[in-house]
């Protein structure tokens, strides 16, 4: 009797039940990852939530989590791979500006040390006298806004003097004072000259050009270059009144911009020796 039942059961043993939904399927699919049989609806690993996927996901999470070293510090693989990727343009530009700023600060500190006490005294006396004259002129308008700066630049272009051979796109329009320290010729020092120079020039060449435009006596430039006879100074930005010397080897395009006020300070023989 039992043999007959076994034989009958064997005859009916066609197809297999799906391990996921228990539905009988005559063409079952065998999953080699979890070693189970599934119907056509659950033949994929994702469809029957294969154990291999779950185990693989746990291993992946373990590998991805930060591992702690002996000293307790954690090493993040994700941070390491991000460091290998190029940074965004905005981040790169910000980092370049941050690295350039200290360079300019260190350069300014070095240049400031080249202004000896007599030169500083000369330019400060000139500046104080000039500011006092401005404060007495109460009717003078304030041109501090950006819109007024545009008007100022347009007016400066109309009266500025310079070499007509300089291309229009290379011209930088400035105001320039000659600071000589000669008390007998204060009117000449108080004259602010509207000029334009070439932004492609070295500062040393601009100093030569400015000394000629400011009608410096020819005897001043004999037996020596204007770089030795003069220092080109500029007022630092900020509330505190402070000047720095623009080095002759620097470029105009990097140091001078439109509407800047420059001070061409004459060095006497005894000042150079200090």
UniProtKB/Swiss-Prot annotation:
Q: Does the keyword Metal-binding apply?
A: yes
What does the UniProt induction comment state? Answer: By transcriptional activator RPN4.
Task: Tell me, in one coarse class, where this protein mainly resides.
Answer: cytoplasm
Q: Which residues bind Zn(2+) 2?
A: 31, 34, 48, 50
SMART domains in alphabetical order: ZnF_AN1
For this record, the Gene Ontology CC terms, alphabetical, are:
cytoplasm; nucleus
Q: Which residues bind Zn(2+) 1?
A: 18, 21, 39, 42
- PTM Phosphoserine: at which residues? 273
Annotated region (Ubiquitin-like), positions in chain:
170-266
Compartments, as annotated in UniProt: Cytoplasm; Nucleus
One annotated GO biological process:
stress granule disassembly
- List the molecular function annotations (GO) for this entry: proteasome binding; zinc ion binding
Zinc finger map (AN1-type) = 12-58
Source organism, top-level taxon: Eukaryota
Sorted keywords for this record are:
Cytoplasm, Metal-binding, Nucleus, Phosphoprotein, Stress response, Zinc, Zinc-finger
Q: Which Pfam family, just one, is annotated for this protein? A: zf-AN1
Q: Which residues form the signal peptide?
A: none
| Known function | Promotes efficient arsenite-induced clearance of stress granules (SGs). May have a role in the ubiquitin-proteasome system (UPS) protecting cells from metalloid-induced proteotoxicity.
Instruction: Reproduce the miscellaneous comment text.
Output: Present with 4280 molecules/cell in log phase SD medium.
Q: Which PANTHER family match?
A: ARSENITE INDUCUBLE RNA ASSOCIATED PROTEIN AIP-1-RELATED (PTHR14677), CDC48-ASSOCIATED UBIQUITIN-LIKE_ZINC FINGER PROTEIN 1 (PTHR14677:SF40)
Q: What is this protein called?
A: CDC48-associated ubiquitin-like/zinc finger protein 1
Q: From what organism does this protein derive?
A: Saccharomyces cerevisiae (strain ATCC 204508 / S288c)
Kindly list the organism's lineage. Answer: Eukaryota, Fungi, Dikarya, Ascomycota, Saccharomycotina
